[in-house]
Amino acid sequence: QYDIIWVDWNNGTDYIQKNAYVLEEVIKWINAEKLANGSSQSNVVLGASMGGLIARYALKDMEDRGIPTQTSLYISHDAPHQGANFPIGYQYMSRHALHQYVKSPALLLGGEVIMPLFTDGVTPLDLLLLQNTPAARQMLINYVGINYGITNTAHDTWQNELRIKGYPSMRKIAISNGNHCAITQNASAGASLLSIDGNYSTGWFTDIVLTTFPGVNTGIFKSLA
């Protein structure tokens, strides 16, 4: 008999270290609860995707600081220990979509005011800005910024810290969602994966708003940078 404890984050896209510190507090609480209830059962910590990085960092940080983890097994489920790859072309497409979205008052009105009423408050802008979050910048091997430039400083800094930190000492198991038979996807480097040719405009309404309020786009992009 055992208990399953699921850990969720108020801000799952925050810095990986911050959520690792939260996990440390959870592990300490679990160990205190076990002690209070006379249990000596060791913990098994499983982290999926980015959660695998959070768990690795938390367990090793506790060991480094001499805090007992009471953990016998760490399971890394498809975690990007060497970094995450999101095709640069898709990132550029996402950035272009963001630029077009904020230039369209009609879309902004529908997406940021009306749509959240039916999507638990989530807006298209929230999704288009996921690339900007601290965790995304830390994990992405190549990160395309708001102005289309590639900057990997956050990733390089994080990977160096993670490499120096190393792995916790308990038994470790890694699970990957990749193909176990090493069969490739027949996509060569630089190949075109998606191509779209077309255009769209909100026409006169956008022209009126941008003419009346010429600084609206500048203000939006300053707030996103």
Model-found features: residue ranges?
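Serine-dependent carboxylesterase/thioesterase catalytic core
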Residues: 20-148, 154-159, 180-224
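Catalytic nucleophile-loop/oxyanion-hole region of alpha/beta-hydrolase
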Residues: 9-25
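Short, surface-exposed "cap/lid" segments of acyl-processing enzymes
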Residues: 1-6
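Short glycine/serine/threonine-enriched helix-capping/active-site loop
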Residues: 7, 77, 175
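Extended ligand-binding clefts on enzyme/binding-domain cores
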Residues: 163-175, 180-186
